[in-house]
Amino acid sequence: ENYKAECRCCGNTRLECVVSLGNSPLANNLLNDENQEDELYPLQMNYCPKCHNVQLSHSVPREKMFNDYLYVSSTTEVFKTHFNDAARNLTRKFNLDENSFVVDIGSNDGIFLNPLKWKGVQVCGVEPAKNLAKLANDNGIPTVNGYFEDEETIEQIGIVVNGGHLIKQEADLVTAFNVFAHSDKLEQITRNVFKILKPEGQFVIEVQYLLDTLKDLTFDNIYHEHYNYWSVLSLSNFFKGLGLHITDVEHINTHGGSIRVFIGSQQLDVKPSVTEFLKSEKEFGLDKLETYKEFSRKVEKLKENSVSKIQSLKDEGKSIVGYGSPAKATTVLNYYGIDSDSIDYIIEDNEMKHGKLLPGVRIPIQGKNGQLDTNPPDNILVLAWNFFDYIKQNNEELVNRGCEFITLKD
């Protein structure tokens, strides 16, 4: 029922299946108890030979994933720093001041808008998860609870900012961090962005970078919330189709490699970075089917190696505890078939996840507690591998007691 036969970008119906990770539960829908059923959906990646977009074969209804969301950006110091830096960079680049108006799509708890508000910039967030929109509003960040592709959400943006008056203030900047992969209604979102932007305003997005995923084999970044896996090549084709232009691209380190892309309706001065990215993508082979088939073969090999490594640790009688329960943990553990027989429990810093179970593999999630001190495990498997160094440094006492910190990529 949820099968997507045509390309989300160009409508081409001749898509090629390049990676299949089997049936997997929704990555962030943690279970409250043992009796709760898992909802499984195919996790399969298709490549469009026409516009080179890489996308999931199935679309899970958005309400199942985003209405109540357990991922709070501000839980992680690394992300706080990232968004503070982003706010500083974009303030400088666009000369933002108290006369500027910035709208952030998928604003979570207001982590990016908060530093802008402190500088006096007028801000408004749009967040589909009720719990996060409430959190942001409680913290003084005006936030509309809704989906940006919906007309009624757009109508409310003016109201929130202008104290109940429907004076439409045009935005100088609209941002979307790690959102552009998360929607099946990209054309509608983009049209709405340019509806509320000033003519010379810019749309800035951050997305995980497909080239990094392929190069570093970070297949665990593939999950149902991410409908699309972007490159500058595929984004460029998508925006061109809407009469828009990419004016600049920057590489950033979040989520195992991402890109920050600047889009405008006028062909403002296009920076050399755009051509440079397109050139390196062509050299890597992002426009060739074989590149993706090769990725799939490497992922299968990685699975073989990782599963046998975990098995040999268990055969030696070693205990293993997981650290971090990001979405990628659901993907990798379900694909590998590593469950609570191998991993006793998962430690997690985000309190909203404590007492829940990782879906599919049903591994219990808990906070750092006495159990770690009284009975430290032989191995700590860092599932939030993009924070490996940060997690290891924060748990020096465990390292000193002989705990070995490992990842599934070692």
Annotate each language-model stretch with its function.
Residues 98-108, 320-323:
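Conserved class I S-adenosyl-L-methionine
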